Swiss-Prot record:
NCBIfam families reported for this sequence: metK (TIGR01034)
Name the UniProt record assigns to this protein: S-adenosylmethionine synthase
SUPFAM superfamilies the record matches: S-adenosylmethionine synthetase
Binding-site residues, L-methionine: E61, Q106, D248, K279
Organism, scientific name: Borreliella burgdorferi (strain ZS7)
Cofactor note: Binds 2 divalent ions per subunit.
Lineage: Bacteria, Pseudomonadati, Spirochaetota, Spirochaetia, Spirochaetales
Binding residues for K(+): E48
Keyword Methyltransferase among UniProt keywords: no
GO CC term, one of those recorded: cytoplasm
Length: 392
């Protein structure tokens, strides 16, 4: 994965806010998962949401006796309210939405594959290819364009919700392009795009000035990365009044790159939100991130990408491979042996290590699933052991 091959190469990442239609769907899915897990730690959940206009359809499969206790429609309305969709002029109104509950039961065939009779060991909830990644570009071990794209939108959200900028509305996206030197170090911000929904009576000039001066510039930690050549594209389409699901239909799991590493790493295609931890698309992705982050923090490489592959009903991964960051085959084999011997990559092992039976998932699903140090998969508690065993 030697992506940087010459000086002056640029790389780009995008992010979406919690008010983006796809993110509304993700949050509803994960809020329902959390509500189920509060009462049943062993529930099997696969919750999908589609949201269009003022209609929310909640589908998927849930296997838990507590399902009947959860007011799923109320959960959806509360999420929409908390995001800030309190007026139909914004593109959605929690007070008037129609919510259709189309959730069914999990397939008995899948349940039997995951929960083997006579065994406490869980099999993987599905087949899947999963990647974990980390790099040394930021203190959170995430790519610099990706982290900045998310930070800009978080800043905008805070100013909107606090009332500091009253004309901002919930829907927004950002995109950041950064120039790298030949050693794969970020050196200059080339371009920042922000598209943000707004009140109809605000001029584009004021929108541009406010977003640049009050949101973007205060968010950039290293001011030397901004110069007179940095290009700002604020609402390049012009007016962005019609937003939310009135402007664009939202669907759970459609922002998998914004959820992970902003295009800097491979992705197996499986989304995270709405899935309990027996689904390795989610749990193994968190574990692979944990391993990759500890490897980079230990100084093993500037970046590290790990691939895991699973088969439904089988507890151990069928394949483990370092797919980026290590160019020496002998050293890669040594690292692989260390991973196999020191990390439990079964669903049970991952769930226990990362405490994935807790109702934590709503907090994961906005502004990226990685880089939030409150979660177990972001802890750097394996660094010393890695350094002792693997440091050259």
């Amino acid at each position: 994965m030697n992506k940087i091959i010459a000086a002056n190469q640029t790389l780009t990442s995008e992010a979406v806010s919690e008010g983006h239609p796809d993110k509304i769907a993700d949050q509803i899915s994960d809020a329902i998962l959390d509500e189920i897990l509060k009462e049943d730690k062993n529930a099997k959940v696969a919750c999908e949401v589609i949201i269009a206009q003022n209609l929310v359809v909640i589908a998927g499969e849930i296997n838990s006796p507590v399902k009947k206790n959860i007011d799923i429609k109320e959960v959806a309305k509360n999420i929409i309210k908390d995001i800030g969709y309190t007026n139909i002029d914004y593109g959605l109104d929690y007070k008037t939405i129609t919510v259709i509950d189309a959730i069914g039961n999990q397939s008995r065939d899948i349940i039997n594959a995951i929960e083997k009779k006579g065994s406490n060991a869980l099999g993987a909830g599905d087949q899947g290819i999963i990647f974990g990644y980390a790099c040394d570009e930021t203190k959170n071990f995430l790519p610099a364009p990706y982290e900045l794209a998310n930070s800009i939108l978080k800043k905008a959200s805070n100013l909107r919700k606090s009332g500091a900028i009253k004309w901002l509305r919930p829907d927004s996206k950002s995109q950041v392009t950064i120039e790298y030197d030949k050693n794969r170090n970020p050196v200059k911000i080339k371009n920042i795009i922000v598209s943000h929904q707004h009140h109809p009576n605000i001029s584009q000039k004021l929108i541009q000035q406010t977003i640049i001066e009050e949101i973007i510039k205060p968010t950039v930690q290293d001011k030397s990365m901004l110069d007179e050549n940095t290009a700002y594209c604020i609402n390049p389409s012009g007016n962005f009044v019609i937003g939310g699901p009135t402007g664009d239909t939202g669907l759970t799991g459609r922002k998998i790159i914004a959820d992970s590493y902003g295009g800097f790493a491979r992705h197996g295609g499986g989304a995270y939100s709405g899935k309990d931890a027996t689904k390795v698309d989610r749990s193994a992705a968190y574990m692979a991130r944990y391993i990759a982050k500890n490897m980079v923090a230990a100084g093993i490489s500037k970046e590290f990408e790990l691939q895991l592959a699973y088969a439904i009903g089988i507890k151990n991964p069928i394949s483990i491979q370092i797919t980026g960051g290590i160019n020496d085959p002998k050293y890669a084999n040594k690292i692989l042996n260390f991973i196999v011997n020191n990390f439990d990559l079964t669903p049970n092992g991952i769930i226990e290590k990362l405490k994935l039976k807790q109702p934590i998932y709503l907090k994961t699903c906005t502004y990226g699933h990685f880089g939030k140090n409150e979660f177990e998969w972001e802890k750097l508690d394996f660094v010393k052991k890695i350094q002792t065993a693997l440091k050259k």
